Each structure stands twice: as C-alpha cells, then as structure tokens.
C-alpha cells in the first residue's frame, strides 16, 4: 500500500477512531520510536503490515484474535505513526527492528502474521531468528524475487523509477487523494471498500514529513530480500499461506511458488479477495488464522 508524502509533523494519536479502546504504546529502538497497539491475553502474536501500510490494516483482526492471543501490532519503522529517521530502509533494518521490538516488549518467542512486505519480513525474520518464531502466517506475502512479480500499475510504475535521482520522492510527495484512491483500489477486489474515510486515513498518515524518503528507500532496497531466499527451503516453522484469488499485486502463482519453497507450509486461496484478504474477507481469514494457531 503506497503512502503519499509531504511535510506534516509527526503527532502520534492517543487513540484510533476505528477502535478507541485499543491500547497504544511506544517502543524506543536504536533507530527511533515505534508506535504499536496491544490487545488481549494469551500466547503472543505479532501482526506486520505491508509497504506503506499502518496498524489500521489489521483493524478487523483485533477483536476476534485478541480473545485468545496477546496481539502486538506495530507501525513498522518509517511507517504509520512511527519515526521516520533518514536511514536506508533495507530488509535487514526491518528484520532487526522487529528483533529489537520483541526484546523491548519482553517477547521471547511469538507467532508472526505478515501481509505483503510484512510477510516478507516475517519469513526472513524466521530464517534469521528461528528460535524466536512459533508459527508463520503469510498473507499475500512478497516473494524472494519481488520486483519482477509485481503486477499492479501503481507499484510497477514506482518500482520502475525507484533508482532515478529525486523523481520517486517527487512522485510520492505529489500523490493526490485521487491517485491514492486508485492505488488503494488495486489492493482490493471490491472497490466499494475504498471509502472516503479509508482514503483520508491513509492520506493523512502519508503526509507526515519523511514519508517520501522512506517509501523510496524501501523500494530501492526491495530486491535485497533475495539474500534470504536460498534458505527458504530450510524454513521449519509451521506456515500458513493465505492468498486473495484476485490479488492484482502478486498473482496466486506467487503464493503457490512460496508454498512449494516452504516445505512446512499449507496454502489457502480466498475467493473474491484482492491483496488484503484479512481486511476484505476478515471472517474467512480470521477463521483460518485461529484454526491454524490453535493446533
């Protein structure tokens, strides 16, 4: 999910309008401050959003999953209401930021659920720190060879220009609400879900100063996730791969490839869903998550 960007100062909310009761906290890792939400009691589960995403993409998981699990939902470094330091946003940075976050939160071992880029961070984290992962749930995750697999027009255009001086940052900074709406519609099968409220929520997050740098740097380093790909066949954590049948970003064939590469995995394809089935078809997705985690 691509953010927009300009220069609004970062002011962290004390509550979200979509769930005012959700507890928000901060964690100070060495690169900056992360905002995260916590809910429920039970075994720990981390939920990781995708490229340019934010805590809100998990809004439909909070209530059902928190009945049985302790949820930790961070805004990744550089995203949402977390700090945007001017560093290089490499896969290694995101992986280490999750390790730091778990250390600070006192989480020795957890199940990880990741969507899109968050899925890639999850499987790469599991390869780097297998002793800290219980189970993996990958929802329309990025594959090891991410850039050639991208299908939606907005991302293909952005990744095509990502290495040109200043142009990607300018493109992000000039992103309008209309352009953002078009990008969000590429994330779902049912365009009616992209309401004015959803657009405005994402638009305001993306206006925070430093966003253009974060998005551009993340895109420029995206292919470095291939460094972890060779070990995917050794991933021994139980893994559930969930895929939207109508995903316009990564087609179902990408999910099938991941399923083949990760020997300990199973694949569930959700009909009538795009790139974010946990948001577009939450009931079916939540049932699958709870059944898998409960084994």
Task: Cite the ranges covered by each PLM segment.
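Alpha/beta-hydrolase fold catalytic core
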Residues: 1-44, 67-69, 107-108, 293-295
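Flexible "cap/lid" loop of the alpha/beta hydrolase fold
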Residues: 127, 137-169
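Conserved alpha/beta-hydrolase catalytic His-Asp/Glu region
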Residues: 147-150, 171-234
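Acidic catalytic loop of the alpha/beta-hydrolase fold
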Residues: 246-250
């Amino acid at each position: 999910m691509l953010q927009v960007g300009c220069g609004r100062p970062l002011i962290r909310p004390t509550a979200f309008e979509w769930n005012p009761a959700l507890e928000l906290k901060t964690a100070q890792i060495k690169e900056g401050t992360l905002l995260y939400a916590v809910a429920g009691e039970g075994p720990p589960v981390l939920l990781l959003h995708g490229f340019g995403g934010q805590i809100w993409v998990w809004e439909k998981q909070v209530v059902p999953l928190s009945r049985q699990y302790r949820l930790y939902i961070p805004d990744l470094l550089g995203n949402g209401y977390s700090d945007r330091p001017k560093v290089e946003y490499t896969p290694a940075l995101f992986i280490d930021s999750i390790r730091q976050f778990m250390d600070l939160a006192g989480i020795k071992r957890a199940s990880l659920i990741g969507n899109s880029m968050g899925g890639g961070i999850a499987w790469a984290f599991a390869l780097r720190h297998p002793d800290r992962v219980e189970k993996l749930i990958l929802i329309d995750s990025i594959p090891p060879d991410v850039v050639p697999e991208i299908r939606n027009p907005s991302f293909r255009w952005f990744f095509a220009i990502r290495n040109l001086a200043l142009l990607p940052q300018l493109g992000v900074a000039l992103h309008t609400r209309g352009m953002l709406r078009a990008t969000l519609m590429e994330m779902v099968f049912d365009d009616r879900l992209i309401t004015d409220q959803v657009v405005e929520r994402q638009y305001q997050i993306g206006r925070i100063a430093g966003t253009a740098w974060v998005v551009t740097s993340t895109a420029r380093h995206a292919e470095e996730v291939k460094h972890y790909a060779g070990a995917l066949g050794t991933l021994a954590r139980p893994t559930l791969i969930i895929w939207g049948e109508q995903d316009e970003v990564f087609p179902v064939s990408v999910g099938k490839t991941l399923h083949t590469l990760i020997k300990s995995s199973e694949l569930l394809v959700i009909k009538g869903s795009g790139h974010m089935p946990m948001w577009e078809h939450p009931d079916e997705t939540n049932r699958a998550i709870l059944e898998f985690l409960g084994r």
